Amino acid sequence: MTVIGIDLGTTNSLGCVYRNGKAELIPNAYGSYLTPSVVSMTEDGKLIVGQPAKDRLITHPERTVSSFKKDMGTGRSWKLGEKSFLPEELSSLVIRSIVEDAQNYLGEEIEEARSEERRVGKECRSRWSPYH
């Protein structure tokens, strides 16, 4: 059973897998360990997550949202195009993106993803360095 850890951050998120007693960072589809916690909706209704969404913050601010994690549990919603999303829904899109990247990187299906802020987040962050 493959289990990954996810550090869901306000600005960036990342995933890791435990192998041989160590946390191994999982690169996203763009080769980076950090995935921006940003979601955007194209004009035709397609949802985009991560770096491509972040790239749209300037060109499509009305269809792109970031920093939504801090509003989880408040009931605040964000409008992308014609649809409204709760921060929990937007966060789930970021998590789904990291799980898909992990499946592609590891070549196997992910059966469980855990986001335990203190334990998993600390371990993932301790393995991350801007020099990777």
What residue spans do the PLM features occupy?
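N-terminal phosphate-binding loop and flanking beta/alpha elements of the actin-like ATPase fold
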Residues: M1-P36, M41-R119
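Positively charged, low-complexity/disordered segments
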Residues: G121-H132
